[in-house]
UniProtKB/Swiss-Prot annotation:
The gene is pelA. GO terms for cellular component: extracellular region. This is Probable pectin lyase A. Its main location: secreted. One of its GO terms (molecular function) is pectin lyase activity. Belongs to the polysaccharide lyase 1 family. InterPro entries: Pec_lyase, Pectin_lyas_fold, Pectin_lyase_fold/virulence, PEL. SMART domains: Amb_all.
Length: 378
């Protein structure tokens, strides 16, 4: 039986609407986030529609069904930057953003740079938004996303953000949070990024959960000139509580994560694999509890610790967690990796009364995270 075209279209739209919804719910500090809630899903077809939906003042569920390629949409800039990390073909170059080369790398060789303007600043996402991909189809290429300027109640799920000026430091970040609250990033893949895969800026990002995501550091260019991306994850907020759970952090050479300023980080059941430099870098004001994680082929798990760190070192010491987190902390697992042992407990009281993610044994993360993290793995 053949249906009239308009009936077929109605059925197709209804099927899409019913099929697209947020999977699961945020654990940890962003528990209770609803994003666009029950708003009727919208399906942008152009980059301008996508930008418009994400920045308007209405609650929205924005569904990506294809690749939105921003490269070339805002022109290119050619100028003089610098080569602080070397002049080999696989070394990243730096854009002279805000005279960074001039002021901070005066002895670095000058270098010609030509970068895509769209990548430098991400798409602004305002309050009460859900950005979700359909299947493995939702990709934003050449531009990141920004949840800033007081935005609250945002969900990002099941998308990929890729190819943001990967040759150039200051070429753009994949995900930026700054001055926001109640943000859940889930099943997101990032790859081939110029600067940070994920950055929480110096203003408070408050309550954030990052879960089941895949931070892929494989790149033709890197600051360490070896194909391992250095600028991974940077938490620098003035009043941040971050749950980092079930993520796959792969092929990085540093800052994975860097934690400082006034950030309380619960790193639980993540999998770090093939990190050529260091994973954690903890500056002053960084408070990190790490439990149930896997470190495989990570020679230097901790480069610097000027904050406070509890690594859940053994079953006896881990009993203290039950008072503050409501469960006994899980030991971490290690394979061909360096040491990671610290038992600062003074900051654990900061977890008391908060929404704290559950923790499984590291063997659960070992078997499940690589195959379940990232876009298309809901």
């Amino acid at each position: 039986m053949k249906f009239p075209a308009f009936i077929t279209a109605i059925i197709s739209i209804a099927s899409l609407s019913s099929a697209i919804s947020v999977s699961g719910a945020a654990e940890g500090f962003a528990k209770g986030v609803t994003g666009g809630g029950s708003a009727t899903p919208v399906y942008p077809s152009t980059i301008s529609e996508l930008v418009s939906y994400l920045k308007d003042s209405q609650p929205r569920v924005v569904v990506l069904t294809k690749t939105f390629d921003f490269r070339g949409s805002e022109g290119t800039t050619t100028g003089t930057g610098c080569a602080p990390w070397g002049t080999a073909s696989n070394c990243q170059l730096a854009i002279n953003k805000d005279n960074w080369c001039t002021n901070y790398q005066p002895n670095a060789p000058s270098a010609s740079v030509s970068y895509d303007n769209a990548g430098v600043l991400g798409i602004t996402i305002t309050s009460d938004k859900t950005l979700i991909g359909q299947g493995s189809s939702g990709v934003i290429k050449g531009k990141g996303i920004r949840i800033v300027s007081g935005a609250k109640n945002v969900i990002i799920q099941n998308i990929a953000i890729t190819d943001i000026n990967p040759k150039y430091v200051w070429g753009g970040d994949a995900i930026t949070l700054n001055n926001c609250d109640m943000v859940w990033i889930d099943h997101v893949t990032t790859a081939r990024i110029g600067r940070q895969h994920l950055v929480l800026g110096t203003s408070a990002s408050n309550r954030v959960t990052v879960s089941n995501s895949y931070f892929n550091g494989v790149s033709d260019y890197s600051a360490t000139c070896n194909g391992y991306h250095y600028w991974g994850i940077y938490f620098a907020g003035s009043n941040d509580m971050v749950t980092l759970k079930g993520n796959y952090i792969y092929h990085m050479s540093g800052r994975s994560p860097k934690v400082q300023s006034n950030t309380l980080l619960h790193a639980v059941n993540n999998y770090w694999y093939d990190i050529s430099g260091h994973a954690f870098e903890i500056g002053a004001g960084g408070y990190v509890l790490a439990e149930g994680n896997v470190f495989q082929n990570v020679p230097t798990i901790l480069e610097e610790d000027d904050g406070q760190l509890f690594t859940s070192p053994n079953s006896n010491t881990n009993q203290v967690c039950s008072t503050y987190l409501g469960h006994v902390c899980q030991v971490n697992g290690f394979g061909s990796s360096g040491t990671f042992s610290s038992a600062d407990t003074g900051f654990l009281v900061n977890f008391q009364g908060k929404n704290v993610a559950s923790a499984s044994a590291y063997t659960v993360a070992q078997s499940s995270v690589p195959s379940n993290a990232g876009q298309g793995k809901l």
